[in-house]
A protein has these predicted regions:
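The two-metal-ion catalytic cores of nucleic-acid processing enzymes
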Residues: 1-210
């Protein structure tokens, strides 16, 4: 039997659709009836109901994806004790006095790559010389998707680096899709000091080091 913190019995109401939950919650609050956990996101509610706190096991039919090996639709999920070895990639850019992109660097364990607007070939193997900004973006995107990081990080990587890169991608009409789907990566810059800017990249986590 479910109980609240006062040890009083309570009922659990489940909805298949979020709009139905929102409507019922509003009507209950209008009647001045107390609710518990009604403000939780449906995704959080799903994790709690299935005792999922970290890793999950997925069981069900799947199909091949364009940028991922498997796409599951309505599978069975259950908690599992598993700690994955995540691929973490650090990103940093350097710009010139006129705001032009001079260098874009990537770094990870036993890996580094720098795309530079040098105009000539470098003797250093990790340096990729590009003729202009557009070529830096094209080669960076190709290398980035091939590396396929789980986590992207850097110092002020969202508010500065990715904000700059997003505008540059738009300038050269290159799709700003850096995730594991073809969906465009979504950047939201916050001017409020108490809110953090976010970058949503499908299938990846972006952690700002600032």
């Amino acid at each position: 039997t479910l109980k609240n913190f006062s040890k009083e019995p309570v009922s659990k109401v489940v909805f298949d659709l979020q709009p139905d939950l929102n409507k019922c919650r509003h009507e209950i609050h209008e009647s001045e009836i107390n609710t518990f956990e009604a403000d939780l996101k449906s995704s959080t509610r799903f994790l709690i109901d299935n005792d999922i706190y970290t890793s999950i096991e997925i069981d069900g039919d799947y199909e091949s994806g364009e940028l991922v090996e498997r796409i599951y639709r309505n599978p069975e999920v259950s908690p599992v004790a598993f700690r994955p070895k995540l691929k973490v990639l650090s990103l940093d850019i350097e710009t010139g006095e006129r705001g032009e992109l001079l260098c874009l660097g990537l770094y990870s364990d036993n890996y580094k790559k720098s795309f530079v607007s040098a105009g000539k070939t470098s003797k250093r193997k990790f340096v990729v010389s590009c003729k202009d900004e557009e070529e830096i973006l094209e080669k960076f995107k190709e290398e980035f998707l091939d590396f396929d990081p789980d986590v992207i990080t850097g110092w002020s990587v969202i508010d500065f680096d990715f904000a700059y890169l997003r505008d540059l991608f738009e300038k050269y009409k290159i799709n700003f899709s850096l995730g594991r789907t073809t969906e465009k990566s979504r950047l939201k810059i916050e001017s409020n000091f108490f809110r953090s800017s976010t970058l949503k990249v499908s299938g990846r986590l972006v952690l700002d080091g600032l």
